[in-house]
């Protein structure tokens, strides 16, 4: 397998810019996955997609969908997936804040069983808070389509981002936080993101939480 060139892109993209306001079209799931009725893991803000790339190999009986707003990264990730011949993995260029409903509404009921949102752009300035990915509307979209018993895994190396994400899921009656402590000490998934590994290698904290859809 030949190596792909490393694509350079802007680190931060404003999701409220005009070019990102058009929602994604629904997918034809039977053309995307070889076994479209397997449980689906949705990774929101997948960046270069290495996390779900590894997950798709570790868990072949799951399907994986990575959403990313930076199109060059999606093109690169899908090329890499094709080289590996993975038929349970797909990447989609879209703005998750306006595309979840049209995407997920076409799924068979109960298929979406796991969602991850890991190390999203923090958008430090208060006036940019609406650019953060976890808005109440996104939480509701997930609640509408995640199977009962399905889970949402959140993590960040910025405590204020993790707190805000948790507060927004906790405010939705469809979700219940798993565990008694404020943060999970370990990642419950078998694969760590590159950002997670780098942060831990520096001896810095990662703030993690797990929510379950209960109703």
Swiss-Prot record:
A matching Pfam family: Methyltransf_4
EC number: 2.1.1.33
Residues involved in S-adenosyl-L-methionine binding: 43, 68, 95, 121
Coiled-coil annotated spans: none
The keyword Methyltransferase is assigned to this record: yes
InterPro entries linked: SAM-dependent_MTases_sf, tRNA_(Gua-N-7)_MeTrfase_Trmb, tRNA_methyltr_TrmB_bact
GO molecular function annotation: tRNA (guanine(46)-N7)-methyltransferase activity
UniProt binding sites for substrate: 125, 157
Segments traversing the membrane: none
Catalysis performed (reactions): guanosine(46) in tRNA + S-adenosyl-L-methionine = N(7)-methylguanosine(46) in tRNA + S-adenosyl-L-homocysteine
GO CC term, one of those recorded: tRNA methyltransferase complex
Catalytic residues, chain numbering: 121
Keywords for this protein: Methyltransferase, S-adenosyl-L-methionine, Transferase, tRNA processing
SUPFAM superfamilies cross-referenced by the UniProt entry: S-adenosyl-L-methionine-dependent methyltransferases
Pathway: tRNA modification; N(7)-methylguanine-tRNA biosynthesis
EC category name: transferase
Membrane recorded as keyword: no
PANTHER family the record matches: 3-DEOXY-D-MANNO-OCTULOSONIC-ACID TRANSFERASE/TRNA GUANINE-N 7 - -METHYLTRANSFERASE, TRNA (GUANINE-N(7)-)-METHYLTRANSFERASE
Protein family: Belongs to the class I-like SAM-binding methyltransferase superfamily. TrmB family.
NCBIfam families (alphabetical): tRNA (guanosine(46)-N7)-methyltransferase TrmB
Task performed by this protein: Catalyzes the formation of N(7)-methylguanine at position 46 (m7G46) in tRNA.
HAMAP family, per the entry: tRNA_methyltr_TrmB
Protein name: tRNA (guanine-N(7)-)-methyltransferase
Source species: Trichormus variabilis (strain ATCC 29413 / PCC 7937) (Anabaena variabilis)
